[in-house]
């Protein structure tokens, strides 16, 4: 897995220098994002399918898809440059468990996707994200949002749903009524 993460890092630096795909501009920044993406493996339940909303340059989906190679990942990203990059990464890393779609969550038919885990990183307010993505989550599925310290201003959440590592707050919650 390390060799593939190193190749992903190389590709992101190469493409990023031309296309401005991410705020990560060097190996250290990308390694930090990789570790941030994988930190959740310490507390999330096993899953068979994941919908990553607003995949951007591939965090957290690419590192997670490498670590959880038996799970199926669907990446939603509306930006054409980022989608082209994600397709390039998929081919270069031979990620057969990845499906990439160029679209926004608002344009996906709820009948077309049903997953165990929904991930998103720095996309939108947690309450809005739950409202948009809940139709795609299986009954016993989980939301996993990579957020900052402002999470509790976005949504009422129990302490066991908030995992804090440094400045990052991971919101991990089973499907429930968030009203």
UniProtKB/Swiss-Prot annotation:
EC numbers on record: 2.1.1.170
InterPro entries membership: rRNA_ssu_MeTfrase_G (IPR003682), SAM-dependent_MTases_sf (IPR029063)
Main location: cytoplasm
Disulfides per UniProt: none
EC class name: transferase
Gene3D superfamilies documented for this protein: Vaccinia Virus protein VP39
Single GO MF annotation: rRNA (guanine-N7-)-methyltransferase activity
Entry's localization field: Cytoplasm
GO cellular component terms given for this protein: cytosol
Binding site for S-adenosyl-L-methionine: 54, 59, 105-106, 121
The keyword Cytoplasm is annotated on this UniProt entry: yes
Record's keyword terms, sorted: Cytoplasm, Methyltransferase, rRNA processing, S-adenosyl-L-methionine, Transferase
Keyword Transcription belongs to the record: no
Catalyses which reaction(s): guanosine(527) in 16S rRNA + S-adenosyl-L-methionine = N(7)-methylguanosine(527) in 16S rRNA + S-adenosyl-L-homocysteine
Function: Specifically methylates the N7 position of guanine in position 527 of 16S rRNA.
Family: Belongs to the methyltransferase superfamily. RNA methyltransferase RsmG family.
HAMAP family: 16SrRNA_methyltr_G
Protein name (record): Ribosomal RNA small subunit methyltransferase G
Taxonomic classification: Bacteria, Pseudomonadati, Campylobacterota, Epsilonproteobacteria, Campylobacterales
Gene behind this protein: rsmG
């Amino acid at each position: 897995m390390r060799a593939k993460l190193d190749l992903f890092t190389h590709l992101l630096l190469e493409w990023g220098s031309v296309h401005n795909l991410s705020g990560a501009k060097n190996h250290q920044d990308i390694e930090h994002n990789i570790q941030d993406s994988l930190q959740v493996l310490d507390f999330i339940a096993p899953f068979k399918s994941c919908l990553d909303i607003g995949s951007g340059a591939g965090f957290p989906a690419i590192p997670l898809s490498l670590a959880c190679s038996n799970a199926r990942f669907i990446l939603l990203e509306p930006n054409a440059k980022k989608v082209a990059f994600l397709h390039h990464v998929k081919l270069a890393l031979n990620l057969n468990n990845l499906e990439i779609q160029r679209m926004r969550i608002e344009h996906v038919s709820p009948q077309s996707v049903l997953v165990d885990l929904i991930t998103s990183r720095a996309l939108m307010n947690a309450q809005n994200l739950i409202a948009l993505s809940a139709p795609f989550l299986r009954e016993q599925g989980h939301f996993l949002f990579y957020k900052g310290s402002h999470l509790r201003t976005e949504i009422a959440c129990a302490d066991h749903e908030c995992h804090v590592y440094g400045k990052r707050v991971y919101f991990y919650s089973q499907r429930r009524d968030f009203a």
